[in-house]
Amino acid sequence: MSSKKEYVVGIDLGTTNSVIAWMKPDSSVEVIPNAEGARTTPSIVAFSKSGEILVGEPAKRQLILNSDRTIKSIKRKMGTDYKVKIDDKEYSPQEISAFILKKLKKDAEEYLGGEIKRAVITCPAYFNDAQRQATKEAGIIAGFDVLRIINEPTAAALAYGLDRKGKEEKVLVYDLGGGTFDVSILEIGDGVIQVIATSGNNHLGGDDFDQRIIDWLAEEFKKQHGVDLKEDKQALQRLRDAAEKAKIELSSKLETDISLPYITATAEGPLHLEMRLTRSMFESLTRDLVEMTRKPIEQALSDAKLKPEDIDEIILVGGMTRVPMIQNFIKEIFGKEPNKRVNPDEAVAMGAAIQAAILAGEEGAQGKDIVLVDVTPLTLGIEVKGGLFEPIIPRNSTIPIKKSKVFTTAEDGQTEVEIRVFQGERPIAADNILLGSFRLVGIPPAPRGVPQIEVTFDIDSDGIVHVSAKDLGTGKEQTMVVSGRHKLSEEDINKIIEDAKKYEEQDKRRKEEVELKNKADDLAYYIDKSLKEYGDKIPQDEKQKLETLVNDLRDAINKNDIARIKMLFDELEREKTKIGEYIYKQNQGNQQAENQ
């Protein structure tokens, strides 16, 4: 019995469309057509009344007649606890996505005449831990061994990077898909592709452009006939299909005719929609949407510390980038034509296929030693004494990455510590996002500052975060995987970065105040300890003065009286030196007495 040949593939699991590709033994990459003969598969799943599950184009056709049982853009819900309820059964976003992946797998196996087990699947650069985990789970449910989850712009750069040799370049990937916008800046050279900055907006895409055409059509029709087509589900779906078709046509034509006979009916009889949409009208309807991509571009350039003229190449990803207004907009910002050599619909899947072939050691990938370097979008760290945020892995660090810092206890005799993990750019932990917490117990009682607790953050190549805390004295360790309950969109991430800039002065002041309180508390603790140990060597009046100062300082700390803390801290710092002097003098006097 002959066993079937096994293939490895790359998959672009998109919001609107999905694509599957493989690398041939001759190193060329082929996009695999689906059973309908198309190179892209709509990311749509429909449940027919008879219980059949339809995926792709057949499901898209159900949107009109069976809209309540048809699911599109499920990618937006990945990593959430959202459920799709069909009849009495609930489906998670992973399960719906798995139906799409299963179709891609089945159709590709038919086409290649073999078996597909291993795959690299892509996700937006801004997907957080929960969203990446969900993408991986969808792959597993669909029957794949998921070799790696990689960022879409990284994959696009990989598809592009293989045919560039020996030249270091700064590449900007402008990815405007059906539902999301991502911009990434990469460094390509010497077989290394490194993401140096990413930004975007995960609620901006081709769907929004379609919606503008739908609104215009509905408005014009209402003016002509006094009927609101948006009230009619079936009419609205026909408008949506017509809008998408018109948008695509206007990329190559200056005008398009939209004809929808029998769109609706009134008591007088049927009504037909006949309209002409020009490219200039389409541009005036959507110019502000294109303009919305400017800010993320500026943010990415700022993060990468680059100016537009520093960018060597601009790669376009996503069908929307075929729109002439978008290409002109990019040209206006960067002063150069975007590179159109990469097919915008297929680049991501092709890059994923290349990475899959490299990871699987496929024949076509021999000698191709590509290293993908992604970055973490926000700083990760823990809460320390006084509620301060102590960064452990800074924003835009390349992953995979592992970093550790050693901390200690804040109280005498402390036998456990709570490790609270935060993500964000603000110096006060509470202003950042709490990702999770866990306790390390069983620390032997000791004075504060003595135990040594090593906290380690480890981000793997899929961008999944593992945190551990280890008592270096006993070897006891506790770990957690960040579950990523906080689903951050690109807007959330950009807002976090902007807030950090906006509140910079205020945050700096608050941080300085907390640090002063911490230093004051440490000083009070030190003086207290010294008085207990050496009190008999210090004159009574000085001892009383120090005790009063310590009590006053602690009172000021409790009342958060910053001015008083500062004054008492400075005074206690001056008095502190006297303790040493008295101890030294007394010891000297004792030695002289012994020598006589």
Swiss-Prot record:
Chain segments annotated as transmembrane: none
Entry-linked InterPro entries: ATPase_NBD (IPR043129), Chaperone_DnaK (IPR012725), Heat_shock_70_CS (IPR018181), HSP70_C_sf (IPR029048), HSP70_peptide-bd_sf (IPR029047), Hsp_70_fam (IPR013126)
Phosphothreonine sites (modified residues): 180
Xref: SUPFAM superfamilies: Actin-like ATPase domain, Heat shock protein 70kD (HSP70), C-terminal subdomain, Heat shock protein 70kD (HSP70), peptide-binding domain
Top-rank taxon, per record: Bacteria
Induction behaviour: By stress conditions e.g. heat shock.
Keyword field: ATP-binding, Chaperone, Nucleotide-binding, Phosphoprotein, Stress response
GO molecular function, one term: ATP-dependent protein folding chaperone
Short name of one Pfam family: HSP70
Record's function text: Acts as a chaperone.
Family: Belongs to the heat shock protein 70 family.
Name by which UniProt lists this protein: Chaperone protein DnaK
Gene: dnaK
